[in-house]
């Protein structure tokens, strides 16, 4: 059994020096709470370093994260009642970004208020826009001649 410095799970390189629970949080879409539930579901020690785990355990974790993660309780999943399929899903890595992009495109297409704000590049969540959040070059004020 050799120490693995980098372990690849769900298209993400994870640090083998971190404990299993904290290493799993390196995957986009898995936070600390989901990582803890995954570890408990598999019955693996979450404090063990990821690089020290045997190949069988790593394969077990990899299989669960990539295929069986939706067997977790629905309140833990990050995309409940998907607008396209109606199912409870848990998205990982690139799928999170892609789903977010599709949601924003859907809002823009239906001309919802949030979609209009996104399309114009304005703040979406009700923040004030008079003084903060300005983009582009700063234009100085020119003093008039006397």
Curated annotation (Swiss-Prot):
A GO cellular-component term linked to this record: small ribosomal subunit
InterPro entries named among the record's database cross-references: Rbsml_uS13_C, Ribosomal_uS13, Ribosomal_uS13-like_H2TH, Ribosomal_uS13_archaeal, Ribosomal_uS13_CS
GO molecular function: rRNA binding; structural constituent of ribosome
Protein origin, superkingdom: Archaea
Key words of the record: Ribonucleoprotein, Ribosomal protein, RNA-binding, rRNA-binding
Function: Located at the top of the head of the 30S subunit, it contacts several helices of the 16S rRNA. In the 70S ribosome it contacts the 23S rRNA (bridge B1a) and protein L5 of the 50S subunit (bridge B1b), connecting the 2 subunits; these bridges are implicated in subunit movement.
Subunit structure: Part of the 30S ribosomal subunit. Forms a loose heterodimer with protein S19. Forms two bridges to the 50S subunit in the 70S ribosome.
Assigned protein family: Belongs to the universal ribosomal protein uS13 family.
Protein name per Swiss-Prot or TrEMBL: Small ribosomal subunit protein uS13
Species per Swiss-Prot/TrEMBL record: Archaeoglobus fulgidus (strain ATCC 49558 / DSM 4304 / JCM 9628 / NBRC 100126 / VC-16)
Originating gene: rps13
